[in-house]
């Protein structure tokens, strides 16, 4: 017998497939990652709905479709060494950790980072390194990265992140001001040349500078 939880996960995966997610590994990992662990218990009944949900500190856990879309875009380039800007709940981090060799994740809000670390241990994911700091600055000492994924909208593409992108690397980043038009951008680096492709309209919380203890 299929449990209610399993049926909700199955329904979510079917929705993602219908909305254009075709990478079977991405779909598998999302189906196996317990999203309900990454949010307040009071919202856990909504965990497998295709919607963003608040996690406190003015932050959200991204809509599953957006996590799947950004991950699928990254995986098209066979990234192994990935920098994530904005750990948040750690859900995107956990998905990445099951698909790439190493994830380096930067979070500006210390309480969120602490909770995300605990969840990584709970899920036995040990290929994740976390840092409390300003996401605009990246994590220079661990770069360059062949993939960078940014989970909040930057007003413009941070130069520090561009500098930490390896030759041939790809950055997936939402760009635009809060409450205004935002676009999901795929940036590729080829030596000193940069190529940008706009994927579509999105809505993210802003990528704020500085950090919070």
Swiss-Prot record:
Classification via Pfam families: PCMT (PF01135)
Compartments it resides in: Cytoplasm
Annotated keywords: Cytoplasm, Methyltransferase, S-adenosyl-L-methionine, Transferase
Domain of life: Bacteria
Catalytic reaction equation(s): [protein]-L-isoaspartate + S-adenosyl-L-methionine = [protein]-L-isoaspartate alpha-methyl ester + S-adenosyl-L-homocysteine
Keyword check for Methyltransferase: yes
Gene Ontology cellular component list: cytoplasm
EC number: 2.1.1.77
Coiled coil segments of this chain: none
InterPro entries, sorted: PCMT, SAM-dependent_MTases_sf
Molecular function terms from GO: protein-L-isoaspartate (D-aspartate) O-methyltransferase activity
Name of the top EC class for this enzyme: transferase
Active site residues according to the UniProt entry: 62
Keyword Methyltransferase found: yes
Family classification: Belongs to the methyltransferase superfamily. L-isoaspartyl/D-aspartyl protein methyltransferase family.
Family matches, as PANTHER family: PROTEIN-L-ISOASPARTATE O-METHYLTRANSFERASE (PTHR11579), PROTEIN-L-ISOASPARTATE(D-ASPARTATE) O-METHYLTRANSFERASE (PTHR11579:SF0)
Protein name according to UniProt: Protein-L-isoaspartate O-methyltransferase
Species, as recorded: Idiomarina loihiensis (strain ATCC BAA-735 / DSM 15497 / L2-TR)
Classification lineage: Bacteria, Pseudomonadati, Pseudomonadota, Gammaproteobacteria, Alteromonadales
């Amino acid at each position: 017998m299929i449990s209610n939880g399993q049926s909700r996960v199955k329904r979510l995966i079917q929705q993602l497939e219908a909305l254009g997610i075709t990478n079977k590994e991405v779909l598998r990992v999302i189906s196996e990652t317990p999203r309900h662990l990454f949010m307040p218990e009071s919202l856990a009944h909504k965990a497998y709905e295709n919607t963003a949900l608040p996690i406190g500190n003015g932050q959200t856990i991204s809509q599953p479709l957006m996590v799947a879309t950004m991950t699928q875009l990254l995986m098209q380039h066979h990234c192994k060494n990935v920098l994530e800007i904005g750990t948040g709940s750690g859900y995107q981090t956990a998905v990445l950790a099951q698909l790439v060799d190493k994830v380096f994740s930067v979070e500006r809000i210390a309480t969120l980072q602490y909770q995300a670390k605990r969840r990584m241990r709970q899920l036995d994911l040990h290929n994740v390194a976390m840092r409390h700091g300003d996401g605009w600055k990246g994590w220079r000492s661990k770069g360059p990265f062949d993939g960078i994924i940014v989970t909040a909208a930057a007003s413009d593409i941070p130069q520090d992140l561009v500098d930490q992108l390896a030759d041939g690397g790809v950055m997936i980043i939402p760009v635009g001001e809060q409450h205004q038009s935002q676009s999901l951008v795929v940036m590729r680096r080829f030596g000193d040349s940069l190529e940008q492709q706009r994927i579509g309209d999105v809505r993210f919380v802003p990528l704020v500078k500085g950090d919070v203890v």
